[in-house]
Amino acid sequence: MRMQHFIFQFLALAWVAGAALAQELPVVDEGELRELCLRGECRFDVVTSVRLADGQVQEERITQHRPAILANSLSIMLGEELQAVADFDNNQFIRWRAAERREPSRNAVLDFKLTQTESDGSISLEVRNNGREPVKLNLFTRAPGAAGAEYTSSCPVIAGGSVYEYWSRPVVEVIVGEAVLVTDDGALQCN
């Protein structure tokens, strides 16, 4: 009986640790970022304006910001649209990359659009999946002036479909970490 209890505790701990790791903000290596910026791949003079709940507009200026597409993550600033491919090998996420002009239909090509609604000021992220498989994304949101981003729940994007994520608080950037192919119908739930 004691061994069963130990195995249960071990499995529970492994499950919690796995969930926590999936919710970690992807790290951008400083050396890699420096090289990318020297090659001109970074975004320069990024200005983002977000309307706050009190009606005022807060502007954020970033002199030099990471590229929109890195192998381990995507960055979508408020007002931006982005198209990226999630590469998989044996159903395991490998990397993000820019879409090619004529991408094979079997690839998970995703379109992102981050906007603020005029009526209530909420922020919405539209994600369109042009691939053949449902995909779940690990999303993180960054508030104006914040150095880091926080994990946020998200819904899977069905094959050939779209999903909208909404936030009532100000968000200037959404960072997309790992993508996961959804192979189980039960996993098509939002979390």
Q: Predicted segments — roles?
A:
Residues M1-F10:
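Bacterial N-terminal signal peptides that target proteins for export
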Residues A17-A19:
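N-terminal signal peptide c-region/cleavage motif recognized by signal peptidases
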Residues P26-D89:
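N-terminal targeting leaders for non-cytosolic proteins
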Residues G31, L36-C37, C42-D45, V85, ...:
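Low-complexity, acidic Ser/Thr/Pro/Gly-rich terminal tails and inter-domain linkers that flank the onset
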Residues Q64-F88, P144-L181:
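Intrinsically disordered, low-complexity Pro/Gly/Ser/Thr-rich segments with frequent PxxP/GP/PP motifs
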Residues L125-G131:
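Asparagine-centered strand-capping/turn motif at beta-strand->loop junctions
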Residues E133-G148:
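Short acidic, flexible loop segments centered on an aromatic residue
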